[in-house]
């Protein structure tokens, strides 16, 4: 069986886009397991400007018409249909070209799995609600109906998918995560500070940044040694700058986009990682920090709440609330101050990633998902 991951972009792990990171990791692990896997990317830039990788990659030009399918991609799909058993794995949702791809796959009798990566969670659907409602009825409903399985990364997505169409065949399965190697930072931060961190795209509607800044400000006014490191960039950078003014002067540091060892070196110096998203598929940044032994504060909307509770590696907020965040930070700060032997949450954090997000344990479930798609 051949597995084709089809995405917008190039599956470049050195981008802030979480879908790129997930697809890169999944394809890498499948290749290492001896599976016949490739990534096909639709992009306006056909340059191979990404790090060396183990799996095959083909890039196809994006068309000016968002529904347009490049002739080269149409031909590649025809060749795939005649080359034996194959499953196409689509990543993302509300992508016009996927409607065209789905129609072509149906005509070629090629099964496909769709992973929306958080796009069908209730909070995500509320953004541009009217436009999405119209688009869903005209185009997205076809994509969903024809999917052999809709692969959900978290429970919030299952709820969203069932609200769109309760008859759809869903599969709930997280992706795995390969823990990064700890990095000694080039310029270690001064000791004695309680460092809270965030890493991701600066998009308030998605990431709940107003809550993050307000909750931290409330906390920091009572804990003068607190700092907030914000790693990333995005459309709400100016708003984050403004919201940071509510915190004590100098306590919020906007570090911009960081990648590779530089990012890992920063994450490893944190005492808490905070992720107050309104919706997610499964946020890679949280797993990166937790794998380094950093406790976390997450909202239920991250789809990580059950894991954090089960492994005891942080705090879970029912919703993105500044008051709830401040209270959670106070509890974690109290543990940090106590420094009682055996009280560190770091072992629990590492155990969560090594157990619940272990690729060798999850890959058979992905294979079963593809076999079900072939049999559908």
Question: What does each model-found stretch correspond to?
Answer:
Residues 310, 315-323, 331-337:
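Conserved acidic donor-binding segment of nucleotide-sugar-dependent glycosyltransferases
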Residues 278:
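Aromatic "clamp/platform" in nucleotide-sugar-dependent glycosyltransferases that forms part
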Residues 4, 188-207, 213-217, 229:
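Conserved donor-binding/catalytic core segment of Leloir-type glycosyltransferases
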Residues 107, 132-150:
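Membrane-proximal helix-turn-helix segments that form the acceptor-binding/catalytic region
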């Amino acid at each position: 069986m051949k597995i084709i991951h089809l995405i917008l972009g190039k599956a470049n792990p050195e981008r802030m886009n979480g879908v790129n990171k997930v697809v890169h990791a999944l394809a890498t692990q499948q290749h290492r397991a001896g599976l016949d896997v490739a990534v096909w990317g639709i992009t306006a830039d056909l340059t191979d400007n990404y790090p060396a990788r183990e799996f095959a990659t083909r890039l196809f030009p994006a068309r000016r018409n968002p529904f347009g399918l490049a002739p080269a991609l149409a031909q590649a799909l025809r060749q795939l249909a005649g080359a034996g058993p194959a499953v196409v794995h689509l990543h993302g949702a509300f992508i016009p070209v996927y409607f065209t791809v789905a129609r072509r796959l149906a005509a070629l009798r090629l099964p496909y799995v769709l992973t929306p990566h958080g796009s069908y969670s209730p909070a995500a659907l509320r953004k541009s609600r009217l436009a999405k409602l119209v688009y869903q009825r005209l185009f997205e409903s076809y994509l969903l109906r024809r999917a052999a399985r809709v692969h959900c990364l978290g429970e919030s997505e299952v709820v969203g998918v069932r609200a769109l169409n309760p008859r759809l065949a869903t599969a709930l399965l997280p992706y795995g995560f390969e823990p990064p190697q700890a990095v000694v930072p080039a310029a270690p931060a001064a000791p004695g500070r309680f460092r809270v961190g965030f890493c991701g795209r600066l998009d308030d509607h998605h990431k709940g940044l107003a809550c993050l800044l307000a909750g931290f400000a409330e906390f920091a006014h009572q804990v003068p040694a607190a700092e907030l490191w914000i790693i990333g960039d995005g459309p709400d950078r100016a708003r984050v700058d403004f919201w940071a003014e509510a915190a004590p002067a100098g306590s919020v540091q906007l570090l911009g986009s960081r990648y590779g060892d530089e990012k890992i070196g920063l994450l490893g110096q944190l005492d808490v990682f905070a992720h107050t998203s309104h919706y997610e598929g499964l946020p890679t940044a949280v797993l990166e920090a937790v794998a380094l032994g950093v406790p976390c504060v997450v909202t239920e909307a991250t789809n990580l709440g059950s894991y954090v509770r089960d492994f005891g590696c942080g705090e879970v907020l029912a919703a993105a609330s500044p008051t709830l965040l401040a209270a959670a930070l106070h509890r974690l700060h109290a543990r940090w101050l106590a420094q009682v032997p055996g009280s560190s949450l770091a072992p629990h954090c590492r155990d969560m990633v090594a157990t619940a997000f272990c690729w060798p344990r999850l890959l058979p479930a992905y294979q079963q998902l593809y076999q079900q798609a072939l049999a559908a």
